[in-house]
């Protein structure tokens, strides 16, 4: 889902398993009549899609659209003038939520075909990595193209504070869209093994390096760029 509010000058880029649907439902109410609001599947009460197609009905904007794709449609000048933000989540928690959606969603698993258990999900390695949605490579370096990345764990505080700066008063995240996916609990975070955590965190290394939101050890920090890794491994007190 995508929200572009010309009234409040912001672009919301939806990421995976970060309360994005709930956020979009609430943002769509205050974004303005001329806002771009893409559809939600299945439909959610209180959400009104609008202005996401061309005059002939061809979709210009889509769900889970990347920031770079949005920039292409609205133009670089408009994109740079607007405040772009997204939400990220701790990797293990994010993967657990993704796993429950794959198993319990009547849309994603309509016929019950997806029957993998948690260890099989981890072994497959198809994790909900959203790095390309809010960043891009420039001269070999990964750079963010959004202005803010909000931590999922503190949305109740950070999202209203951000919107307050953009002129939206008394915003509250009330919607609880798709929370039913966790009613049948298949794995608790405490049951995730150390090996599974390492596997997930290895896959999310580039995300962790870019966002800086969650703990990252020295090895991960050195891996952010080959030059930094090269210099960090050079004996102290000598010249390369």
Residues of each region from the PLM?
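Membrane-interface amphipathic segments in extracytoplasmic regions
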Residues: 1-240
């Amino acid at each position: 889902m995508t929200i572009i509010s010309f009234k409040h000058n912001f672009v919301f880029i939806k990421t995976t398993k970060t309360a994005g649907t709930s956020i979009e439902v609430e943002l769509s109410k205050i974004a303005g009549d001329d806002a771009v609001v893409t559809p939600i599947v299945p439909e959610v009460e209180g959400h009104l899609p609008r202005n996401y197609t061309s005059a002939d009905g061809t979709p210009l904007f889509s769900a889970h659209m990347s920031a770079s794709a949005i920039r292409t449609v609205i133009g670089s000048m408009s994109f740079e003038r607007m405040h772009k933000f997204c939400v990220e989540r701790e990797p293990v928690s994010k993967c657990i939520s993704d796993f429950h959606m794959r198993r319990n969603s009547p849309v994603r698993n309509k016929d019950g075909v997806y029957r993998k258990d948690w260890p099989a999900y981890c072994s497959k390695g198809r994790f909900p990595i959203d790095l390309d949605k809010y960043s891009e490579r420039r001269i070999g370096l990964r750079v963010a193209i959004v202005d803010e990345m909000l931590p999922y764990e503190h949305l109740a505080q950070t999202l209203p504070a951000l919107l307050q700066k953009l002129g939206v008063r008394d915003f509250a995240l009330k919607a609880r869209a798709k929370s039913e996916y966790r009613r049948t609990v298949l794995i608790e975070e405490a049951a995730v093994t150390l090996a599974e955590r390492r596997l997930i965190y290895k896959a999310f290394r580039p995300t962790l390096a870019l966002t800086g939101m969650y703990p990252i050890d020295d090895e991960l920090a050195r891996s952010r760029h080959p030059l930094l890794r090269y210099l960090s491994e050079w004996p102290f007190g000598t010249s390369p």
